């Protein structure tokens, strides 16, 4: 093979390899369909008691989705301060459905078994409506969950009212909870009052969700 032909062949191989790596990275990352203002993608997933729970089960209700990771310090900030539990108690008492979700794959940091999830709820004294297990990452990808905590507010018409960070303080400091602007509270209160949500999307901060490859 001539020098020019060899160079062409090598270049083609490099391009092909790069294309393959890009395709693979795209395939294993979240593929979102949820968009603010658009219908919330339907889903179903098992809860920690083995029951299949679907978004359609809560038609006509305000629903909040909370992606969690029991080993993530950004999640710990909101549980160790009591912030997340207080929000769960306040809004579920008002009729809001609160679904906590774990989407990390088996063998990855953040994955929990049903028993581990129940232990987390007891340790945190958490009060969600239910805890869903998503080890295949199907629900997480639908809602572009990339980091924990990732939060989604769905209105009574089953449209996405807000998705993204819980607040505007991307830190692990417990003291920051008191001074933060909580996007989820703002979205929930506006949605409950039938008012427009001022901020409908932000970038979630926290620990990356380790999705199943493939």
Predicted regions and their residues:
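Bacterial N-terminal signal peptides
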Residues: 9-19
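Short active-site neighborhood of thiol/selenol oxidoreductases, capturing the structured segment around
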Residues: 56-76, 98, 188
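Thiol-/selenol-based redox modules, centered on thioredoxin-like
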Residues: 153-214
């Amino acid at each position: 093979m001539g020098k020019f032909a060899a160079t062409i062949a090598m270049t083609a191989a490099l391009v092909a390899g790069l294309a393959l790596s890009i395709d693979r990275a795209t395939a294993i990352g979240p593929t979102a369909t949820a968009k603010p203002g658009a219908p919330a993608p339907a889903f179903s997933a098992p809860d920690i008691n083995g029951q299949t729970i679907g978004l359609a089960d809560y038609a006509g209700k305000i629903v909040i989705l909370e992606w969690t990771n029991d080993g993530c310090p950004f999640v710990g900030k909101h549980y160790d301060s009591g912030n997340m539990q207080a929000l769960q108690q306040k809004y579920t008492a008002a009729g809001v459905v609160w679904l906590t979700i774990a989407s990390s794959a088996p063998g990855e940091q953040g994955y929990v078994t049903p028993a581990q999830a129940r232990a987390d709820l007891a340790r945190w004294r958490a009060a969600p409506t239910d805890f869903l297990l998503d080890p295949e990452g199907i629900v997480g990808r639908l809602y572009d969950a990339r980091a924990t905590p990732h939060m989604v507010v769905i209105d009574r018409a089953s449209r996405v009212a807000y998705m993204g960070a819980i607040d505007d303080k991307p830190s692990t400091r417990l003291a920051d909870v008191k001074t933060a602007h909580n996007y989820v509270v703002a979205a929930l209160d506006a949605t409950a009052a039938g008012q427009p949500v001022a901020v409908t999307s932000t970038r979630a901060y926290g620990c990356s969700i380790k999705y199943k490859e493939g």
